[in-house]
């Protein structure tokens, strides 16, 4: 009774405490950092962005001094600022003339090599290169910074930066740029040096030099290199260990665009998709697109659940993660001679010595000392020799001690062996790299569609290697998640859509070296329409276009796509009209006069994929898609259409006209795709592929229809 009363008292106190904390957190008089987005920079010659931002703050706060209020002013590539505001002040700013949106600055998360060989970009003379243009290509990475001393970013053999470069090297104390790493900016007050390893990893994946004999303690030995090793890189550090704030991210876009980068790579994202006017990555990417800069963005790591993709704007290229043909496996050898195969990146070698196996989830340290602990939960034991556990992940993680992660069936087999054997023994071997013939397969963690903001725009767009990627790393960051890990490495293995994103960034840069004048939409179209068609290796929604988009990126095919689907800023503004943005708001965003007339259907945006969300009540349906293609292949070519239904699809698809005769380069022709059917499964999309072929080029677009059942 006494114990129960004490528990009740403690519970009540906790509830009161949490209530008071909650009240403090949601006090409307508390000042929070808000982003104030004001669209494009006004063209008036006497307009000074920062002065205008200060005037707004003075007016809304009633204070002549706004010291400590203005956090950042966005004034180089677009207009806006971030500031400390109360809720009532936020409301006041939102009602002011010239303001598009005001939203709280949230934190994004980081979305955490043989892969280039796997995609067909072999090292050396086997891959066609245009080194002169590649050396003039600049990629900006908005991430956790960079390790400038890494061999992956050595400037040996590089000339001075391209003349178009307008950036700076402000990396902080003891940070030096060079002719490879030509720019660095910090928005965190930590300096641009990478303390987490993530930014170093992504940058080297896309554009790192070829560095021979790299490995993780002998695992995955080979040459680490990026897709465009001759290109230049610039690091924009927006992330700390606590996250990547909206106001930092928007500042990085503001600078990167004005600095003169050719591409922007963003391997971070939120927990859920946001409306475009409140999504700093979508905002920054829009203004980048308007300046001819493609933004490549990771899809997110919240899969395999549907509607989890966070990168949903059509003006940026959204990347899902897949496996490659190399997997890391860690074998467990039992005392009875049986071998079980698990996953991990285990650099420790027990040299085949067998130790007693102890099974249990919550064991006293004295019971596991000098033994291999077998548990359903990864233990923090410091006295066990090794660990064997189980989970349903389809990728390997680095361990700080000998570890193998078994499938549930193999784990059950191991437990059965322990329970039926008087003195069970075993050993965990060092990880080995094996050939994976089932690749590529979409990783379970990769976020899935459908798109919840623009429901008729298919996302993700493309998939690329993002599982067990070996690339450069920061020696200041732990290789594992165990804080007791004392090892430090220059190259490490990571998995995530963060790792997939820079692969596509590298491909986009590779395309740009052959076609410097291609617009962001043309590069995006080339990547999507030449992708490998993915084969569903599983069942259910996680094995559909909502998982992989148009397919798996094919770098070599993408430099010669034949036909492309072009889009420009005006097309995207019309699309936003159809999303119910007002003419007044869109004039602020675009900087141009805008009149939204009529209803523009999302699905008629000239996008390389076609998607339509149907009403749940639709037992039978007919939808149309209008598209225009531009000939970038050869003159006097004839393209014939072909429809290929995917497994289980009963769609009826017609293309009109079914033949396109292109007399000249850059000629445009339009067509309509009509899709009809009935009784669509509410849990699965129904899909097909439209292929335009002239005998040399095969220009493929996925067609997806789905019920509002997600």
UniProtKB/Swiss-Prot annotation:
Domain PA: start-end pairs: 354-414
Q: Which CDD domains match?
A: PA_subtilisin_like, Peptidases_S8_3
What GO cellular-component annotations does this UniProt entry give? extracellular region
- Domain of life here? Eukaryota
Residue ranges constituting the Inhibitor I9 domain according to the UniProt record: 33-110
PTM (free text) = The C-terminal propeptide is autocleaved.
Which class of enzymes does this protein belong to? hydrolase
**What are the positions of the active site?**
143, 198, 498
Family statement drawn from the similarity comment of this UniProt entry: Belongs to the peptidase S8 family.
What is the protein name given in its UniProt record?
Subtilisin-like protease SBT4.8
Q: What is the native source organism of this protein?
A: Arabidopsis thaliana (Mouse-ear cress)
Q: Which gene encodes it?
A: SBT4.8
